[in-house]
A protein has these predicted regions:
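Short S/T/G/P-rich N-terminal loop/turn motif that feeds into the first structured element of a domain
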Residues: 1-54, 61-67, 71, 94-96
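C-terminal structural segments of small proteins and small subunits
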Residues: 66-91
Length: 96
């Protein structure tokens, strides 16, 4: 199977504290599904399209595992810590 990439592009963060709490819990959950962090913030340049304030990319063994992680009760509970104070685009993309 092809690897999959979980890409989160953050548009708005109203509470850094809430996002930090989410990130601490989510990191452990995602890693328990075999997720490997490739990008967690850092410098960036936007050449085209909408600008984002933060981008996070995780690599998974395949799209099924990435989806299972996202839909898990534990991950959804972690996301509930930040979802009311954070606006983001989130997608899972299969690699080549």
């Amino acid at each position: 199977m092809k690897k999959a990439y979980w890409i989160a592009k953050y548009k708005k963060i109203n509470s850094q504290e809430a996002l930090t709490k989410y990130a601490e819990k989510a990191k452990k959950i995602i890693e328990s599904f075999g997720g490997k962090a490739l990008v967690r913030g850092g410098k960036y340049i936007t050449f085209e399209g909408d600008d984002f304030i933060r981008t996070v990319i995780w690599e998974f063994e395949n799209i099924n595992v990435a989806t299972e992680c996202h839909e898990s009760k534990d991950y959804q509970e972690a996301w509930s810590l930040a979802k009311n104070t954070t606006k983001r685009d989130l997608m899972i993309i299969e690699g080549i």
